[in-house]
């Protein structure tokens, strides 16, 4: 029996998986959301704080590769694997809040959180791939948007916690509760789609063969430029906003946390719009435009330090919308450009390298220790180097004859 042209339940499944991802991603930045009280209690310096986020990045990269190297995503139903990842992420995050007493004891819990989250987002993508064909670009855009809002969720939880006078552990505990709820939702309501197919096993040799293609290398370089900026921005913009508000004489931790949520979550809008229009505009056009605006916004945000909070937040929101809008386009480009049979391994390697790179820029900003306007201008100019390199890579990709394989010929 041939499946229908489009699965009738696809939008319901998209809503379930998107909400599940949004909730289950909450533990990721829970340490960044409580950076100020955590640093005071544990006496952390500016290198100690980013270490807690970098540990998650490393855990995720290792977990994503391990998932790709095994048949776990095919042996276990995707909804079961998703729920298991969410439960483990919630438990590890709770361990960080209620069992860890210093940086050394917290890092293993943060690494475990990243390992567990590797069973959430990639598995969510696999679930949706079984339900969508022609509209897969939009579905992936919605899912990346959900990941973005979920990454911002701890900042909203912190804003509520501060306004209620709650300890930082309440914020982290609430993020764990959100992850549990997201896992339960997907486990109870999601199901396998009519076009579900086994995921290809990861092979380093196959991935290397894909990288021999110049077009694949350029798409990967564009992705690395994008990742150079993205997660460092999400990690540090809350502290930047708090310091900027204080310099403007408007110090209020609850307002700063709420503003950080708005800035990071606004990227969800960019993801959905990019997912809807990428095939029409072309991947290189969209990625070049997004990186040009995000890189410019990074520099502008540094110069807006200490300005009227409304202006600083407005610039940061433009940055937030564009810094992640093009995220799904790089992986889609590799899937279109990689030789037959190599896309799965090429994408797994791309994701692992990208997330490992984020640790470098997150740490670099901490090492710069930007305490005032000049410090933040230098730090954000460093982040803007990523999109600058990405723009060059995607422009060179656009000139190559293989680029016609992307976005139905729209490059």
Cite the ranges covered by each PLM segment.
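Extracytoplasmic gate region of multi-pass secondary transporters
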Residues: 31-35, 215-268, 331, 361-362
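C-terminal membrane-cytosol helix-exit motif in multi-pass small-molecule transporters
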Residues: 176-197, 390-398
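Juxtamembrane intracellular "pre-TM" segments in multi-pass secondary transporters
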Residues: 2-7, 193-221
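Helix-loop-helix hairpin linking two adjacent transmembrane segments in secondary transporters
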Residues: 134, 142-190
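C-terminal transmembrane helical hairpin of 12-TM major facilitator-type secondary transporters
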Residues: 281-330
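Cytoplasmic helix-loop-helix junction between adjacent transmembrane helices
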Residues: 109-146
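A late C-terminal transmembrane helix in Major Facilitator Superfamily
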Residues: 337-371
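Conserved MFS/SLC helix-loop-helix module at the cytosolic interface between two early adjacent transmembrane helices
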Residues: 64-102, 278
